[in-house]
Amino acid sequence: GEDTLSLHDALPISEMEAFCNLCPCRIIAITGSDGKTTTSTITAELLRAQGYTVHLGGNIGTPLFDRIADIRPDDFAVLELSSFQLHSMHCAPDVAIITNISPNHLDVHPDLEDYVSAKCSIYRGQRPDGVLVLNAKDAHTPRFAAEAPGSVRYFSSIGPVENGVYCSDGVIYRAHGGKAEKLIDVSDIR
């Protein structure tokens, strides 16, 4: 006999998950308790300044699913994703960023662990070539780093990290392989 799939057997997925599954370009997905919108906006603007076409969506900007036919493989999609979107979502962004975790939305999530678990969905589906970017000073970072399917980078506004970007004495550095490279003075950022 033929294998058939009835509508009854289908699993519903959100518009954002459908977008992630069909999007032809690289996806940078951002979540966290605080700083999602700022980080998403700055990420999109930095990519635009480098000449890339960027599609900003999720909790910010306009819905992207209806514009998927206009997205080219060499573009970037920058997505701000909330715990509500991530709770039942399976996504595999090329780069996943978690800004921080603090007790939030506990009126919707039964407890902090459920909230944290929802946030973890941002990286759980990543491929081995995916990158997870974490706040070096967040208490949940060791857990996230241990679970990451791909490589991990860190950021810190209060001192050095081994592999990532940090700010120290008014200067932003990129660290990799035991060496730190000066990127820019904070005072030069406009």
Where are the model-predicted features located?
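Single conserved hydrophobic/aromatic residue that forms the stacking wall/gate
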Residues: G1-D9
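Helix N-cap / beta->alpha transition motif
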Residues: L7, N135, K182-D185
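Ubiquitous "structural anchor" signal
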Residues: D9, D66-A69, G178
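Compositionally biased, intrinsically disordered low-complexity segments
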Residues: D9, G125, F144, A175, ...
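Phosphate-binding loop of NTP-binding sites
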Residues: S14-A136, H140-P149, Y166
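Adenine nucleotide phosphate-binding catalytic loops in nucleotide-utilizing enzymes
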Residues: H109-E113, G150-R190
